[in-house]
């Protein structure tokens, strides 16, 4: 059973995982270490601890912004890829997703990793109209959700339905598709809907729009905007806000 970890111990835990794997691989006869197998075992151990957590959300953990005892709500949780670590570490977790099958999967995950949490914490609802109360969590996650908005009105409803869940001084972590860095590579479908080179259609934001939204929400950037350009396919921007009290 994995014990509680504070953010400052996360890097040490990853190192220990590699050490444990190497010790398992060394054997009684101290045979030569198979490095590929060692690190494969380490990655299995890390995957068990962290799941498939978004690397930029992991960065927030390492920087101490999401600490033990905080309430965390995943708005658009999918099958729970970002929740494994938080469930293992006894955070107070809630989640919402419009897909009932996804919510059933998250309830099953929580039942194994955090059976003390009530199933009512995990709800099959649209993020724009969830039944969670205002100021429900210290940290609200919106990872790869908002770019599925049908149009501007839907985007605004999803965003504001998510933002209202953040407590005063709380953290809003969002990753969403954008046009930043590939402005000329997208085909407009009207409004902010675009066809992407990877064959998908998305609602895309840009830097001026995100800054305008930040001001309109009454938030403050916790980090500068960060955008990852996936070679000639799409762009994903990390938008992290603090809710000003």
Residue ranges and their predicted role:
Residues 156-168:
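A short glycine-rich, Lys/Arg-flanked "PGG" loop and its adjoining helix->strand segment in the class I
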Residues 3, 14-21:
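Short linear motifs in low-complexity or flexible loops
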Residues 139-153:
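A short SAM/SAH-binding and catalytic strip from SAM-dependent methyltransferases
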Residues 35-67, 73, 78-129, 171-245:
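Class I (Rossmann-like) S-adenosyl-L-methionine-dependent methyltransferase catalytic domain
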Residues 128-140:
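A short acidic, Gly/Pro-enriched loop at the edge of an enzyme's catalytic core
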